A protein has these predicted regions:
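Low-complexity, charged, repeat-rich alpha-helical/coil interaction segments
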Residues: 11-13, 40, 82, 133, ...
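Cysteine-based protein phosphatase catalytic domain of the PTP/DSP
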Residues: 55-143, 161-198, 202
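PRPP-dependent phosphoribosyltransferase catalytic core
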Residues: 203-210
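A phosphate-binding catalytic loop at a beta-strand-loop-alpha-helix junction
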Residues: 141-160
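Non-catalytic regulatory/accessory regions that flank a structured catalytic core
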Residues: 1-55
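Sequence-pattern detector for short linear motifs
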Residues: 32-33, 99, 157
């Protein structure tokens, strides 16, 4: 059942709105890239996803559900968290270097923060931390939402690494994500990292515990 936002959440919501306005040039830049790269349909889908998040606080379900237990998208808000809970989301992985859900008071108890600078790939050890967190949460019956600012680069890189770790090739992993989010825009560095990750296939449990 949805509850009224706490004062901390209300402040976080206002701060997030201010940040959203500040992010508008980046949103428009991504929109233009999407239009040039994949045409008007993908650009329109990108806009629908973005403005749905602005209005409801959560992305459209059909643009975020990669597998039944793994969803990916952009920044949610306190208003949007109940919508994610209705979809069964129990845990969150945040890759935004510029915004910590926990500090904003909108993180669930099962929360992993992997701060990554925008347009850069996460480190391999952070990929492993994220993969183990997702695996453990799903194994315990949970459902995970992975996000960055717009849900087109940093977050989908982690999801691609998770899918590769589950046995998919990099191309299969990207195709699986694109079925849900046709407008993703991983950078060349992020794509290269997944290729490298697939070739090396590190022992994540050993790497994280070292």
């Amino acid at each position: 059942m949805a509850t009224d936002p706490t004062p901390v959440e209300q402040v976080a919501e206002r701060n997030l709105f201010v940040r959203t306005l500040a992010d508008l040039p980046e949103v428009l830049r991504r929109l233009w890239q999407e239009y040039r790269r994949q045409g008007p349909l993908a650009a329109t889908q990108y806009l629908v996803d973005h403005f749905t998040r602005l209005i409801t606080g959560a992305p459209p379900k059909h643009f975020s559900r990669v597998t039944p237990d793994l969803h990916v998208g952009g920044q949610y808000t306190a208003k949007g968290w109940p919508l994610l809970q209705e979809r069964g989301i129990t845990a969150v992985v945040n890759l935004r270097d510029e915004f910590d859900d926990a500090q904003a008071g909108i993180a669930p108890p099962a929360y992993l923060y992997l701060p990554t600078v925008d347009n850069t790939p996460p480190s391999v050890i952070d990929l492993c931390r994220g993969i183990l967190f997702i695996e453990n949460e799903i194994a315990s019956g949970g459902r995970v939402y992975v996000h960055c600012m717009l849900g087109v680069g940093r977050s989908v890189t982690l999801v691609a690494a998770y899918l590769v770790h589950q046995g998919l090739t990099p191309s299969e992993a990207w195709w699986t994500i694109r079925k849900a989010r046709p407008f993703i825009q991983p950078t060349l560095g992020q794509v290269a990292l997944i290729e490298e990750f697939a070739e090396q296939m590190p022992d994540c449990a050993q790497m994280v515990s070292a």
